[in-house]
């Protein structure tokens, strides 16, 4: 009965429509052996080529024999099998990471576009309950997705609507560690959920429905806000606080290596809601950069700090510095050439800003820090602004301001022009 229902579900959902080479994760337990059997008998209708991937965790004496048996089964079925053995200090997380790294490698090397796992409805209920116990955010209580991106293709979980009780008792290997309550998932499966089902026999289904409802809520809100430019500060501020929170959570999903604690999330949200111009270092080599118009989270650059450098430019010479081409007294050809009046009698110093810098504007010296604030110059522009200096006095801050000193040189007989052209950085 399950075979017909499975095939019907796969054809309705079209999980395999875009896949021809499919890799099945097989542990040897009832769940994965059932999945293997279902895909074998549905192979022709689904138009897929199958292969098996198996990881021997080396934690039980019988695991080597089980691996050999799976290799034999694969040969009998005429299906390729890829195996690997775990080594190192064992933990649930380490083993999981090893498995999926191995699966991804096999997919890439064998050109498989789908990895299929045997997670079922009971696993889904356990996952939702476990995340609830650990205090996960609401969006993460949606449980496992039936299809999601993975490695060079997709990870497909076709059994999420089937219960373990639906599976026939076919040949499989029983993992004795599943009955040991050393791990949280085993305690949930063997102790917590059975007790709660005494109060509500439909408790597992209730957990699954909760997960599905949360997933639908997440999908609906994402759809309604899909056209918002979240990195636009004005757009972000126009939203009510609850929508701001949702948008930021959605935005953070783009950074797989960045897992903020609840406290860190609140700090970032507060910065976006209140700070005007700000840079905030986050964990995992990420930083938040915000100016008056936009914000972004990005990887911290490990390039050499160009701000420690300065360079001398002599008359009738050309040089490149800070993603610009500078020509002292020799005209440049091209579009968008900037011009600054300078003296031809002494060399120019090109550098980045320093603490305490000031520039003469309208007869008064003004600190660069205050100038940047008044002009609402973004943090990025502040750090990349090139200072043009002559005789230890600032003539210009590129793209920001030109000093009275440079303007006065326009009518000086000993003046010339510094030509500036942007180059690709």
UniProtKB/Swiss-Prot annotation:
Matching CDD domains: TilS_N (cd01992)
GO annotations of cellular component type: cytoplasm
Localization per record: Cytoplasm
UniProt note: domains: The N-terminal region contains the highly conserved SGGXDS motif, predicted to be a P-loop motif involved in ATP binding.
NCBIfam families noted in UniProt: lysidine_TilS_C, lysidine_TilS_N
E.C. number(s) listed in UniProt: 6.3.4.19
Protein name listed in UniProt: tRNA(Ile)-lysidine synthase
Keywords for the protein's UniProt record, in alphabetical order: ATP-binding, Cytoplasm, Ligase, Nucleotide-binding, tRNA processing
Gene assigned in the entry: tilS
Similarity field: Belongs to the tRNA(Ile)-lysidine synthase family.
Keyword ATP-binding: yes
EC category name: ligase
Known function: Ligates lysine onto the cytidine present at position 34 of the AUA codon-specific tRNA(Ile) that contains the anticodon CAU, in an ATP-dependent manner. Cytidine is converted to lysidine, thus changing the amino acid specificity of the tRNA from methionine to isoleucine.
Principal place of residence: cytoplasm
Catalytic activity: cytidine(34) in tRNA(Ile2) + L-lysine + ATP = lysidine(34) in tRNA(Ile2) + AMP + diphosphate + H(+)
Family annotation (Pfam families): ATP_bind_3, TilS_C
GO BP terms in the entry: tRNA modification
GO molecular function: ATP binding; tRNA(Ile)-lysidine synthase activity
Protein residues bound to ATP: 27-32
